[in-house]
Amino acid sequence: MQRITPLLLILVSFSAIASNNPPNALFGYKESPRSNLGLFPQWLSVLERHIVEMTPEGQCDAMEFNRCHMREWQSFLRSIRHMDADTQIRMVNGYANKKEYVLDIENYGINDYWASPRQFLHNNGDCEDYAIIKMMSLKQLGFNKDKMRVVVVQDTNQRIAHAVMSIDRNNDILILDNQVEEVISHRDIFHYVPVYSVNEDSWWMHLPNGRE
């Protein structure tokens, strides 16, 4: 993910409505919930493809739908199913972060493409692809999908768009970031400005609220 798309202009248009909402904890920003996921065709495409691609088809030497990549992932998830929730979160973060970072332009010939877990396991990927497979992994382990989001942010240090995964956990919001080895609290991050976040049912726009 190299830039914030024109969708940002749509999000900003809702600012007057969102500013009346109570403050949200994520990075100390307010948020405005929405249900129209049609604004996010790439995200909807990921959800649809993931359902189809979870079917164990294809050969182990296939270039695209390689069932062995899925088998390895599923084996990993089974191996940590007995662990406590916090350990599972750390293990999932580490598992995904071992994959090589590859720009969408190199993988798919376009500047921004949201890959399904199966595509990420085969092709590697960029920031949102790490976030997506982490979310799908934790969902499969039994975590509540309503507590997790893919969060698109502006990295004010590098001045680029970025994406991470967030999960509500024990009165905190934990951030799983491909740029950071450890799982950390959102309270300890000050260089990310959240733009929007999505899960399977809703999306949110984020607006400044001030931080303590």
Report each predicted region and the residues it spans.
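Short, linear, compositionally biased motifs with a strong N-terminal bias
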Residues: 10-11, 142
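N-terminal signal peptide c-region/cleavage motif recognized by signal peptidases
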Residues: 13-15
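A structural boundary/capping signal
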Residues: 18-212
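Sec-dependent signal peptide recognition
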Residues: 2-9
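Residue-level detector of alpha-helical hydrophobic segments embedded in or interacting with membranes
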Residues: 1, 17-18
